């Protein structure tokens, strides 16, 4: 046999062997993996349907809320859009299953038998033709030795068989190569169809989401505005110190943990550096009307009183003696419960009995005197009953009345008490009330610090220095010249001999320890002991 024919034969057999032992098993494995991919598609579709159905239910619940209708509409639209895209994804799954996997599985089973038969047929035909050619060549060699007269005819027959054999092996190799190419082209064309289906799906998804996402973003950003996020009926009158982001509940679901510097006094923040302000905190220019509406300036004698208490995080309205029994406070302004049934509703001047000794995030829990209604209410809306009723529309500054009533010479500016309106005491530090006049800060800065440290915290910033309850308003309005002179003397002596700090600056070994404030998300009624 000629070497070139043997080479053609070996090459053709290698192609058939590659199809049978490599391509077809790989195609079977591809069908198996495709079925797993298909099951994952169905699982994804079912999980997405359940997930976005739950989002739609939450959005429908938000539509019933008077404060979150815009956000509820956004959630419902998002859910509908995603479910529509999920249905379009089913078309991709059907194309992948019907147009690719089924054809691959069917063709693989048929092709295995077809390639096997083709290989056997080629091998038998090649051997038969090779045997005939070998036989004719042997006969020609014998006839040439005998010098037979039919040698010429035999040579022509051998040449004809040789040409046929060469044409056969060449055509068989081209046919085997064509079969191999046809199979790879089938695989490429089927996946091209799948890719085209994916392209159509993603094109529709892009066109559907491109404009809607921008609209949802604008509506979501617009809902951050307090005028749209809350209705006027739920907010009530703008009296008392404001709450960040208009929060009217004692919980902080979305409040991140704050650094220690935000819970210390304004003066300590200047020494330790700024950790950043809360994004939702209102600026000092917006806090100014609230400071004028609810003034609470302690008198000189109560400001520098030497009465020591064990903690500076006591609840608002606690008696100076620290005795047992419920504390009573008087409402400065009206408070509406709105749609939240856990809030306490009362009017200005009502007396509320505080049932929880400590405030939680600036909220107290109490019971309206004379009724069985109980619930949460802002600490800034009430005042200790011992201070007496105060008209919120007519602020009283004790230092101003004391200065106008006293005929004494004006005090030295170095000893002058800064005239500023202090907010209702929360559970944060009051060290700025005892600052020396030289280190006093501006009123707007003090209020900015107070607005950032609204959440109750047990993290001490310096020595505990709780402020006792101020004098009743009746005493401030009817203070005589004798009381004024006594208060001024106490003030002068307090400024000359300031109270000793428990931990002087630089001696507290735990001054740099940062504690994480505790936050409760429980809106239910507390356990009253």
UniProtKB/Swiss-Prot annotation:
Gene that produces this protein: BAIAP2L2
Signal sequence segment: none
Protein name, per record: BAR/IMD domain-containing adapter protein 2-like 2
Positions of post-translational Phosphoserine modification: 231, 272, 302, 478, 481
Source organism: Homo sapiens
Protein task: Phosphoinositides-binding protein that induces the formation of planar or gently curved membrane structures. Binds to phosphoinositides, including to phosphatidylinositol 4,5-bisphosphate (PtdIns(4,5)P2) headgroups. There seems to be no clear preference for a specific phosphoinositide.
Compartments reported by the entry: Cell membrane; Cell junction; Cytoplasmic vesicle membrane
Listed Pro residues bias regions: 463-472
Family annotation (Gene3D superfamilies): Arfaptin homology (AH) domain/BAR domain, SH3 Domains
Comment field on protein domains: The IMD domain consisting of an antiparallel dimer of three-helix bundles, featuring on one side a positively charged. The N-terminal alpha-helix inserts into the lipid bilayer. Also forms homodimers and homooligomers. The residue Trp-141 is essential for oligomer formation.
Matches recorded under Pfam families: IMD, SH3_9
SUPFAM superfamilies: BAR/IMD domain-like (SSF103657), SH3-domain (SSF50044)
The SH3 domain, residue ranges: 324-387
Boundaries of every IMD domain copy: 1-239
Residue spans of biased composition, Low complexity class: 299-313, 403-413, 452-462
A GO cellular component annotation in the UniProt record: cytoplasmic vesicle membrane
Protein origin, superkingdom: Eukaryota
GO BP, one annotated term: positive regulation of actin filament polymerization
Key words of the record: Cell junction, Cell membrane, Cytoplasmic vesicle, Lipid-binding, Membrane, Phosphoprotein, SH3 domain
Membrane-topology descriptor: Peripheral membrane protein
Tissue: Expressed in the epithelial layer of the intestine (at protein level).
GO molecular function: phospholipid binding
Region described as Disordered: 221-327, 403-510
């Amino acid at each position: 046999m000629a070497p070139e024919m043997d080479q053609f034969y070996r090459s053709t057999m290698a192609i058939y062997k590659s199809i049978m032992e490599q391509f077809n098993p790989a195609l079977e494995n591809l069908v198996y993996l495709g079925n797993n991919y298909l099951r994952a598609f169905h699982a994804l579709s079912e999980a997405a349907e359940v997930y976005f159905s739950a989002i739609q239910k939450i959005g429908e619940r938000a539509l019933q809320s008077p404060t979150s209708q815009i956000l509820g509409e956004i959630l419902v639209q998002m859910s509908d859009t995603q479910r529509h895209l999920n249905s379009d994804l089913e078309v991709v799954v059907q194309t992948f299953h019907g147009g690719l996997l089924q054809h691959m599985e069917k063709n693989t089973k048929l092709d295995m038998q077809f390639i096997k038969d083709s290989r056997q047929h080629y091998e038998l035909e090649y051997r038969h033709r090779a045997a005939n050619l070998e036989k004719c060549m042997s006969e020609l060699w014998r006839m040439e030795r005998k010098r037979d007269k039919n040698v010429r005819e035999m040579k022509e027959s051998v040449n004809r068989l040789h040409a046929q054999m060469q044409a056969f092996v060449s055509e068989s190799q081209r046919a085997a190569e064509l079969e191999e190419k046809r199979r790879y082209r089938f695989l490429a064309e089927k996946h091209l169809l799948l890719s085209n289906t994916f392209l159509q799906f993603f094109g529709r998804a892009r066109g559907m989401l491109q404009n809607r996402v921008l609209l949802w973003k604008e509506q979501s950003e617009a809902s951050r505005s307090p005028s749209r996020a809350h209705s006027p009926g739920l907010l009530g009158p703008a009296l008392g110190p404001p709450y960040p982001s208009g929060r009217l509940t004692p919980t902080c679901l979305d409040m991140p943990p704050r650094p220690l510097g935000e819970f210390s006094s304004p003066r300590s923040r200047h020494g330790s550096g700024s950790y950043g302000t809360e994004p939702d905190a209102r600026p000092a220019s917006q806090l100014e009307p609230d400071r004028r509406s609810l003034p609470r300036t302690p008198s000189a004698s109560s400001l520098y009183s030497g009465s020591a208490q064990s903690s500076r995080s006591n609840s608002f309205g606690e008696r100076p003696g620290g005795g047992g029994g419920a504390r009573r406070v008087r409402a400065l302004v009206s408070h509406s419960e709105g749609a939240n049934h856990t809030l306490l509703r009362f009017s200005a001047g009502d007396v509320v009995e505080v049932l929880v000794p400590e405030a939680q995030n600036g909220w107290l829990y109490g019971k309206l005197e004379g009724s069985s209604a109980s619930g949460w209410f802002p600490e800034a809306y009430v005042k200790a009953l011992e201070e007496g009723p105060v008209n919120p529309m007519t602020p009283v500054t004790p230092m101003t009345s004391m200065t106008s009533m006293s005929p004494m010479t004006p005090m030295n500016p170095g000893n002058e008490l800064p005239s500023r309106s202090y907010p209702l005491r929360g559970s944060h530090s009051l060290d700025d009330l005892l600052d020396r006049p030289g280190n006093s800060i501006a009123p707007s800065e003090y209020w900015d610090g107070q607005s950032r440290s609204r959440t109750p915290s047990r993290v001490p910033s310096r020595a505990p220095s709780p402020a006792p309850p101020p004098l009743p308003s009746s005493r401030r309005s009817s203070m005589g010249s004798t009381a004024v002179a006594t208060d001024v003397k106490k003030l002068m002596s307090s400024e000359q001999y300031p109270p000793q700090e428990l931990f002087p600056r630089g001696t507290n070994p735990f001054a740099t320890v940062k504690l994480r404030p505790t936050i409760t998300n429980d809106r239910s009624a507390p356990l009253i002991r």
